[in-house]
Amino acid sequence: MTADEALRRDVATANRIAHAAGLVTAFGHVSARLPGRDAFVIPTRASPMLADAERLLVMSFDGDVLEGEGLPNSEAWIHARIYAARPDVGGVAHVHPPACVALSQIGATVRPLHNSGAVVVQQAAPVYERIDLITTRDLGDQAAAALGAGRALLLRGHGANVAESDVRRAIVLACFLEEAA
């Protein structure tokens, strides 16, 4: 198996884990940066539980589909702009964890109160207050700026973005984030 095939397998697996863990239903997506390229691998608009390593898209940080067939998720800008802003990030999870969404709805956030939470956030996770879907480059840039150098960002009434060094770590931290909430 080539490194590219392994990365694609990991992306598909991470999306199915997100679904199995209850972090997403029909919507949500996990991606991975392609090493040495200003591009990332992400599923199409299909449900994350249907993610297949053979049917992923390669997208640029400018939002263009470079490889693959199918429509990209309208919120692929989340991934594109986090990768553009953060060279240290190799995996991004955009999920809709129920407890995180509930906290953000009441103006609260996730704090590092126990082991799992402390792994994800050393301080309270910031909350992106805008309630729109992140469907443009500008909104993607705003969300990436709100994340800053952190690992997790709650999206008020919407979900959470988790950024890590690779896709495997990103999905594990997304699970930890919901547990901490």
Residue spans of the language-model regions?
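Glycine-rich flexible loops
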Residues: 1-181
